[in-house]
């Protein structure tokens, strides 16, 4: 896996780029992605490893905020029927963050959102392609500080919807075995 460090100005004008989200702060990466999608109308962006995105803040506080946001609109007889649909999976959470940064009510914003794909882990067809890291990973700076507080989107998902997370984790283990067979590792 080849990782390059690039700034936004050095991104190509057209084509497809793959961004490895491992260790990035979710909001900062989302601003880069939203800006690139709006400035370059023929550029497609694929974000992989969305479950490894980081949200800064106290772990308990972040998880409670997500739980409150989800349960605020629920009704007792059908939790998903009324109110806005709040995503729980890390890939959908990140896409929702980017959607909030785009002008989704006009054509430009809608087309930008259509050109964004977000995956948890790395799909097999993108395994050997170049992946970009847009800037110095801020998580490395956070780990140096002993009292730095952050939580990954996977941890948030595990605390919100354990059954779905557990099912994904089992599928992920099978997927890793399959990748090892294909790559011969």
UniProtKB/Swiss-Prot annotation:
This is Large ribosomal subunit protein uL13. It holds the Pfam family Ribosomal_L13. One of its GO terms (cellular component) is cytosolic large ribosomal subunit. SUPFAM superfamilies: Ribosomal protein L13. InterPro entries: Ribosomal_uL13 (IPR005822), Ribosomal_uL13_bac-type (IPR005823), Ribosomal_uL13_CS (IPR023563), Ribosomal_uL13_euk/arc (IPR005755), Ribosomal_uL13_sf (IPR036899). Keywords: Ribonucleoprotein, Ribosomal protein. It comes from the Archaea. GO terms for molecular function: mRNA binding; structural constituent of ribosome. This protein is one of the early assembly proteins of the 50S ribosomal subunit, although it is not seen to bind rRNA by itself. It is important during the early stages of 50S assembly. Part of the 50S ribosomal subunit. Belongs to the universal ribosomal protein uL13 family. One of its GO terms (biological process) is negative regulation of translation.
């Amino acid at each position: 896996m080849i990782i390059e460090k690039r700034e936004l100005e050095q991104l190509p004008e057209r084509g497809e780029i793959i961004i490895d989200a491992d260790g990035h702060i979710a909001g900062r990466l989302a601003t880069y992605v939203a800006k690139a999608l709006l400035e370059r109308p023929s550029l497609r962006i694929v974000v992989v490893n969305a479950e490894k995105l980081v949200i800064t803040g106290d772990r308990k506080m972040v998880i409670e905020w997500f739980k409150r946001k989800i349960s605020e609109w629920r009704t007792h007889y059908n939790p998903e029927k009324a109110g806005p649909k709040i995503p729980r999976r890390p890939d959908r959470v990140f896409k929702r963050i980017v959607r909030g940064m785009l002008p989704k009510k006009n054509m430009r914003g809608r087309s930008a959102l259509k050109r964004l794909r977000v995956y948890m882990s790395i799909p097999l067809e993108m395994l050997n392609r170049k992946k970009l890291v847009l800037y110095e990973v801020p998580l490395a700076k956070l780990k140096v500080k002993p009292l730095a507080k952050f939580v990954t989107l996977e941890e948030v998902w595990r605390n919100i919807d354990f059954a779905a997370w557990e099912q994904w984790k089992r599928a992920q283990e099978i997927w890793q075995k399959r990748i090892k067979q294909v790559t011969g590792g």
